[in-house]
């Protein structure tokens, strides 16, 4: 992972020997059309402190599902929002851990699907995180 000058982000120290993964907000697997695009996903600007179980579980599974939908039915616009609060965990390094993640999908026919994931260990199916888009 690389940093971007003049942008304050997390860094390797924030992920060292703890429960947090470098959760890609724009998944590397969705940018395999070129090495240049793939490399851009490995920036600290594109990652968030994400519970390891969530990142490797439901979050990853929904990323794969979105790629399947895009391949089968056409483009899917994806927007991610991180949720922070006054109760968000702050690591000793000074990095703030998001409380959760919103993922908003808009399909080419303007149909929408919205999801919310608490930033915690879970064993749900990704579909159980769907929320009302309104």
Locate the predicted segments by residue.
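Domain-level detector of nuclease and nuclease-like folds
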Residues: 2-134
């Amino acid at each position: 992972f690389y940093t971007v000058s003049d942008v304050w982000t997390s860094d390797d120290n924030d992920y060292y020997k703890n429960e947090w993964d470098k959760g890609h907000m724009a998944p590397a697997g969705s940018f395999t059309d070129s090495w240049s695009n793939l490399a851009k996903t490995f920036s600290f600007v594109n990652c968030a402190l994400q519970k390891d179980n969530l990142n490797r579980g439901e979050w990853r599974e929904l990323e794969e599902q979105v790629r399947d939908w895009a391949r089968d039915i056409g483009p899917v616009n994806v927007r991610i929002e991180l949720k922070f609060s006054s109760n968000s965990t702050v690591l000793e390094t000074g990095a703030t851990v998001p409380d959760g993640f919103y993922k908003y999908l808009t399909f080419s026919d303007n149909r929408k699907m919205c999801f919310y994931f608490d930033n915690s260990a879970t064993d749900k199916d990704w579909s159980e995180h769907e929320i009302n888009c309104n």
